[in-house]
Amino acid sequence: MSGHSKWNNIQGRKNAQDSKRSKVFQKLAREIFVAAKKGPDPSLNPSLRLVMDKAKAVNMPNDNIKRAIDKASGNTSGENYDEVTYEGYAPGGIAVLVHALTDNKNRTSTNVRVAFNKNGGSLGETGSVSYMFDRKGYLVILREGLTVDEEEFMLEAIEAGADDVEVSEDVFEIFTDPATFSEVKEALQEAGYTFATAELSMFPTVYNEIAENNQTQFDKMLEALEDDDDVQEVYTNAEIN
């Protein structure tokens, strides 16, 4: 992963996502609803605890979080969402994974296909690009105000169960096996650390630089996908400088 900081990619798109905060909250509410159907108590439901932490990290109001949990707990309408993943390529051969939660697969697949086709991309079959990504736990700790040195922190994180640690001037990035993510997170929390990001995510095994003549179409395609109410996450192997 060295040299391909996910944190840099996150920061590179942060302003655009902040401008759509209400849509972010709407999508998180759906994710909370789905997780809470497995149980409303986050201490007994790791999936709910994880998405609640994700919601709090973007300052989603507690009332919104509680409302989504209550809706799932008292759901008698039969409302339900299926998890669906779409795979394909953006212009220039950039691999794209689209994760959706939908109550209408036909609607979502049509919208996703249009987003690809209208912007020079192509939707592929299951397995066409997913082999280029690994699922990992991902934690980010801001270094501002910390006194711990790099070697000391790296040792601490590895002893907590981390698979890898990347160090930059501003942040520590910690990568874990998905199965040990919660364990590592809790160990570092108990050591006094707080997280700017804590999530399970997909990471490219190889990054692909976007050619300048493909950048506009690529940006439009990502915007179209992220604007879709059913799309929860979009992962690519684009390298953002």
UniProtKB/Swiss-Prot annotation:
GO biological process, one term: regulation of DNA-templated transcription
Domain of life from the UniProt record: Bacteria
Stretches with biased composition (Polar residues): 1-14
UniProt subcellular location: Cytoplasm
One Pfam family this sequence matches: TACO1_YebC_N
Gene Ontology cellular component list: cytosol
Residue numbers spanned by region Disordered: 1-22
Gene Ontology molecular function, alphabetical: DNA binding
InterPro entries in alphabetical order: Integrase-like_N, TACO1_YebC-like_2nd/3rd_dom, TACO1_YebC_N, Transcrip_reg_TACO1-like, Transcrip_reg_TACO1-like_dom3, YebC-like
Keywords: Cytoplasm, DNA-binding, Transcription, Transcription regulation
Family to which the UniProt record says this protein belongs: Belongs to the TACO1 family.
Name the record gives this protein: Probable transcriptional regulatory protein lmo1535
Protein species of origin: Listeria monocytogenes serovar 1/2a (strain ATCC BAA-679 / EGD-e)
